[in-house]
Amino acid sequence: MGNHFVNWNEVDVNTPELSFRGMRIVCKVVSVYDGDTIKVVFPFLGRLYKWNCRIDGVDTPELRTRSALEKEFGYFVRDKLREKILNQVVYIECGNFDKYGRLLVTPFLKGMDIAQWLIENGYAFRYGGGKKDSWSEYLVVKKRKNNNNNNNNNIVLKGCVVDDENVKIDVEVQGEVVV
């Protein structure tokens, strides 16, 4: 099927690899696995194809980990990302493929850099390769600080809801709820 048009004698290790590096592509997000792994669909060679992508420049908590705290926050972050981009038409800036074959991308929704949104909301660490920061250590320290605040009757963060227009923070101060 089509092989009769290829001169296989000219094919060797120097044949270029498929690359979308530097391209901006309009696509639809069809799946969000976790906070930094998504599937998108976009046209290529006249057909629609699904691509596994990793959001470039960030690291989010893992879903498959022994740390219950990290896993819980991982599902929270995944759900926030789903609320933001699942089934949305976005454009992606493409990089290389990572070691797992995923296309490294920076997704944009209505001009908003989703990687930056993840970082600004505390859902992701910046990540440029190499050793990752420990989500488990970060979350344990954060939980310990909250517990210490409880013991000292200081301000305790009870909840934070952020949407496109509002930020609502509930705190408890010496038994009173302040909104």
Residue ranges and their predicted role:
Residues M1-V179:
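Small beta-barrel nucleic-acid-binding modules, primarily SNase/OB-fold domains
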